[in-house]
Structure formats: structure tokens, C-alpha cells
């Protein structure tokens, strides 16, 4: 409360959860509860790693592969490694978010960039295991530990 006015807490959020058409296929993953109900009480700071990193819409879908400690972000059809552009952008973005006074972040589950836990990580035989963390989410959580 500041001057008798209740200030809303600020939360980062994956942009697609607010209904914005930023997913690889031009779609969204609107969560009406987050937008319409919780949104009355919080101020969201939307972040879409793929579009903000310059990957465009539409774009090829991506997945994680390799080592759980240093996963690679790879396009699913052509196998293009997008890790370095994502890591570079994410490092800059988390530093920008320092001034946003965030109280938390709502990540898009299962996303190879924004998934907080149990994201599919493909091994060298292309067998998936739900043990990964999205590239941006991992960098964000290291930068802003609990």
C-alpha cells in the first residue's frame, strides 16, 4: 500500500498464456484464469523468449536435446541449433528484468524455452525423458534464485 492505494504485485509471464499469438505456429495458449481472474490482482510483465530472441512467427518447432546440465535448443525438422542466440538473448533479458521488481514468474509448462521443469529432453538416440528445463527458464531461475 502506497498513499492509500494498493499496488499490484508484478509477475513475469509467458506471453502466450495471455492469449497473444506468439507460438511457433502462430497460435497461443490462453489461460483464462491467469488473464481474467488473477490478472485483476497482479500486473503482468509478458515475455516470449522465441519472438523476443528474433525467431519469428511462424517458426519451426524446437526441442531440447543432449546433456541435462547444458541442453541444446534445436529445431525439430531441420536440426538447426538455436542455443547460442537464445542464451545470448536470455542473459540480456534477465538483466533487463532486474528493474521490473518482479515477485515471481509464470512459465509455460513443457516449453523448450520457458518450461520450468520436466521438459522433454532428447538423448543421442532421440529418446525423450521429462528431465529438462527450458533454456530461458533455467537462466532466469539461476539469475533470480528463491
Where are these regions (language model features)?
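Glycine-rich anion/phosphate-binding loops
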Residues: 78-99
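Short, surface-exposed acidic-centric catalytic microdomains
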Residues: 49-69
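Extreme N-terminal starter segment of soluble prokaryotic enzymes
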Residues: 7-11
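Short N-terminal binding/cap micro-motifs at the start of the first secondary-structure element
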Residues: 18-26
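Short catalytic helix/loop segments, enriched in acidic residues and glycine
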Residues: 27-45
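Short, Lys/Arg-enriched N-terminal segments with co-localized hydrophobic residues
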Residues: 1-5
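Internal, conserved structured core segments that host functional sites
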Residues: 93-146
Amino acid at each position: 500500500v502506497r498513499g492509500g492505494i494498493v499496488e499490484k504485485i508484478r509477475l513475469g509471464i509467458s506471453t502466450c498464456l495471455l492469449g497473444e499469438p506468439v507460438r511457433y505456429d502462430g497460435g497461443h495458449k490462453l489461460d483464462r484464469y491467469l488473464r481474467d481472474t488473477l490478472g485483476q490482482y497482479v500486473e503482468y510483465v509478458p515475455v516470449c523468449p522465441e519472438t523476443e530472441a528474433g525467431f519469428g512467427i511462424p517458426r519451426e518447432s524446437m526441442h531440447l536435446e543432449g546433456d541435462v546440465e547444458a541442453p541444446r535448443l534445436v529445431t525439430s525438422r531441420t536440426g538447426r541449433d538455436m542455443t547460442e542466440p537464445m542464451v545470448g538473448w536470455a542473459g540480456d533479458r534477465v538483466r533487463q528484468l532486474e528493474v521490473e521488481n518482479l515477485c515471481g514468474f509464470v512459465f509455460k509448462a513443457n516449453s523448450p524455452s520457458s518450461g520450468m521443469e520436466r521438459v522433454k529432453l532428447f538423448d543421442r538416440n532421440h529418446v525423450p525423458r521429462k528431465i529438462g528445463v527450458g533454456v530461458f527458464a533455467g537462466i532466469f531461475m539461476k539469475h533470480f534464485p528463491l
